[in-house]
Amino acid sequence: MSKSHSEAGSAFIQTQQLHAAMADTFLEHMCRLDIDSAPITARNTGIICTIGPASRSVETLKEMIKSGMNVARMNFSHGTHEYHAETIKNVRTATESFASDPILYRPVAVALDTKGPEIRTGLIKGSGTAEVELKKGATLKITLDNAYMEKCDENILWLDYKNICKVVDVGSKVYVDDGLISLQVKQKGPDFLVTEVENGGFLGSKKGVNLPGAAVDLPAVSEKDIQDLKFGVEQDVDMVFASFIRKAADVHEVRKILGEKGKNIKIISKIENHEGVRRFDEILEASDGIMVARGDLGIEIPAEKVFLAQKMIIGRCNRAGKPVICATQMLESMIKKPRPTRAEGSDVANAVLDGADCIMLSGETAKGDYPLEAVRMQHLIAREAEAAMFHRKLFEELARSSSHSTDLMEAMAMGSVEASYKCLAAALIVLTESGRSAHQVARYRPRAPIIAVTRNHQTARQAHLYRGIFPVVCKDPVQEAWAEDVDLRVNLAMNVGKARGFFKKGDVVIVLTGWRPGSGFTNTMRVVPVP
């Protein structure tokens, strides 16, 4: 499977950690990692950025796309439809500003993140950005009286969950703002709770509330979610991040609301509570992909167990060949500082090493002081971590875990990735209509980037969900002769790869094409030197 280092020669562009990637044992692999080994130019992991006040101007979005943003996430827990419509328009304007050059054009996907059946606090009186300090030991009254909806302060807090007094008991815990603030219930009334502040801190407006252990009876898809999903279909979003998915039926419900018109929208289920982890397999089967939403997960299950859930979820998604996103607090300190903590750098790298297809930024890009730096940081860390994957072992295990199927595309994908290791290919070029061929290749985790050429804009945008796929949109009209059309698209991929520094003249690339037009006919693999 491996050539010796010297044999690969200096012409080979991808020296990144090759020695370590081809080790025989995991210990040997770790021992061979080298801090002076340069990573490959391409980054294989997708970067998802939440767009908010700090990043929604067209100019900032252009810079974020240049810095490496692949998917723009709209968080529907905040903002009106008009606000999000404008943000989506800005994202598309920024994306299309690069469209004049087919080689530099990067399709950016739009993701709608539903509010889901969550509980949130009201507005702190004053302004939307006002905060109040809750001191440890102080008494805080939680009320359902709508008179306080926009008048919360350090003494009284309004919540939007009408049944809270029925599901919590005296002695129960109430967590606010990803668990940063904890309250203990001391007394219950018909429409209020009296609590004592256990862990204090500064509280802002519209923060999430968790009631671990309580049987919260909220519907999987709220009335607001239904309106938001319909709005998403109108706006032609590429994917939905569905919050608080607890079982397969929840996913089917989201799919039903998206309807015929939204049937191509990918549904990514967010796993953020104990039931979601426990019933993970049925959720995975019903979904197009998964997000490990570590914020709420870390309150609903003990904080020290979150990494177990993360590894289990990523492992099962990799095995099933479905995309998985790691999210929440990845570079949290960069909201206020230009550099991440060492722990955060490690966290991003380890999510990539675990096998995440995408990594996500939330507050870092939505409201932080350093949105561009955060994107660049994720880009740099992801590239280094990808090079340090134990590729040889990973490929063997993925190949072994895939069942013997009559699906020819799967055999092609596995064969092309194995060939790419054997001949140290600098890239794999895949011509794809629906994107399926490229997704199958990505499933086997080649070291080299997969340049997927398609004429379908949505296929290109959604391809960012899969690790390693670099989508290229072919805007040229279809040629009459099939062979000429194939050559046209392969040449476009060659030009993009050279312009991006993925490979240079004389390197070897693997080209996967179909033998006739249409989806589902990819069956030809060639090993081609770069002209």
From Swiss-Prot:
<keyword id="KW-0670">Pyruvate</keyword>
<feature type="binding site">
    <location>
        <begin position="75"/>
        <end position="78"/>
    </location>
    <ligand>
        <name>ATP</name>
    </ligand>
</feature>
<feature type="binding site">
    <location>
        <position position="207"/>
    </location>
    <ligand>
        <name>ATP</name>
    </ligand>
</feature>
<feature type="binding site">
    <location>
        <position position="272"/>
    </location>
    <ligand>
        <name>Mg(2+)</name>
    </ligand>
</feature>
<dbReference type="GO" id="GO:0005524">
    <property type="term" value="F:ATP binding"/>
</dbReference>
<keyword id="KW-0547">Nucleotide-binding</keyword>
<feature type="modified residue" description="Phosphotyrosine">
    <location>
        <position position="105"/>
    </location>
</feature>
<keyword id="KW-0808">Transferase</keyword>
<keyword id="KW-0067">ATP-binding</keyword>
<feature type="binding site">
    <location>
        <position position="296"/>
    </location>
    <ligand>
        <name>substrate</name>
    </ligand>
</feature>
<feature type="modified residue" description="N6-acetyllysine">
    <location>
        <position position="475"/>
    </location>
</feature>
<feature type="binding site">
    <location>
        <position position="120"/>
    </location>
    <ligand>
        <name>ATP</name>
    </ligand>
</feature>
<feature type="modified residue" description="Phosphothreonine">
    <location>
        <position position="195"/>
    </location>
</feature>
<feature type="binding site">
    <location>
        <position position="114"/>
    </location>
    <ligand>
        <name>K(+)</name>
    </ligand>
</feature>
<keyword id="KW-1017">Isopeptide bond</keyword>
<dbReference type="Pfam" id="PF02887">
    <property type="entry name" value="PK_C"/>
</dbReference>
<dbReference type="InterPro" id="IPR001697">
    <property type="entry name" value="Pyr_Knase"/>
</dbReference>
<feature type="region of interest" description="Interaction with POU5F1">
    <location>
        <begin position="307"/>
        <end position="531"/>
    </location>
</feature>
<dbReference type="InterPro" id="IPR015795">
    <property type="entry name" value="Pyrv_Knase_C"/>
</dbReference>
<feature type="modified residue" description="Phosphoserine">
    <location>
        <position position="97"/>
    </location>
</feature>
<dbReference type="InterPro" id="IPR018209">
    <property type="entry name" value="Pyrv_Knase_AS"/>
</dbReference>
<dbReference type="InterPro" id="IPR015793">
    <property type="entry name" value="Pyrv_Knase_brl"/>
</dbReference>
<feature type="cross-link" description="Glycyl lysine isopeptide (Lys-Gly) (interchain with G-Cter in SUMO2); alternate">
    <location>
        <position position="270"/>
    </location>
</feature>
<dbReference type="GO" id="GO:0000287">
    <property type="term" value="F:magnesium ion binding"/>
</dbReference>
<feature type="binding site">
    <location>
        <position position="113"/>
    </location>
    <ligand>
        <name>K(+)</name>
    </ligand>
</feature>
<feature type="modified residue" description="N6-acetyllysine; alternate">
    <location>
        <position position="270"/>
    </location>
</feature>
<dbReference type="GO" id="GO:2000767">
    <property type="term" value="P:positive regulation of cytoplasmic translation"/>
</dbReference>
<protein>
    <recommendedName>
        <fullName>Pyruvate kinase PKM</fullName>
        <ecNumber>2.7.1.40</ecNumber>
        <ecNumber>2.7.11.1</ecNumber>
        <ecNumber>2.7.10.2</ecNumber>
    </recommendedName>
</protein>
<dbReference type="GO" id="GO:0003729">
    <property type="term" value="F:mRNA binding"/>
</dbReference>
<dbReference type="GO" id="GO:0004713">
    <property type="term" value="F:protein tyrosine kinase activity"/>
</dbReference>
<dbReference type="GO" id="GO:0005634">
    <property type="term" value="C:nucleus"/>
</dbReference>
<dbReference type="InterPro" id="IPR015813">
    <property type="entry name" value="Pyrv/PenolPyrv_kinase-like_dom"/>
</dbReference>
<keyword id="KW-0488">Methylation</keyword>
<feature type="modified residue" description="N6-acetyllysine">
    <location>
        <position position="62"/>
    </location>
</feature>
<keyword id="KW-0630">Potassium</keyword>
<keyword id="KW-0539">Nucleus</keyword>
<feature type="binding site">
    <location>
        <position position="464"/>
    </location>
    <ligand>
        <name>L-serine</name>
    </ligand>
</feature>
<dbReference type="Pfam" id="PF00224">
    <property type="entry name" value="PK"/>
</dbReference>
<feature type="binding site">
    <location>
        <position position="77"/>
    </location>
    <ligand>
        <name>K(+)</name>
    </ligand>
</feature>
<dbReference type="InterPro" id="IPR036918">
    <property type="entry name" value="Pyrv_Knase_C_sf"/>
</dbReference>
<keyword id="KW-0418">Kinase</keyword>
<comment type="similarity">
    <text>Belongs to the pyruvate kinase family.</text>
</comment>
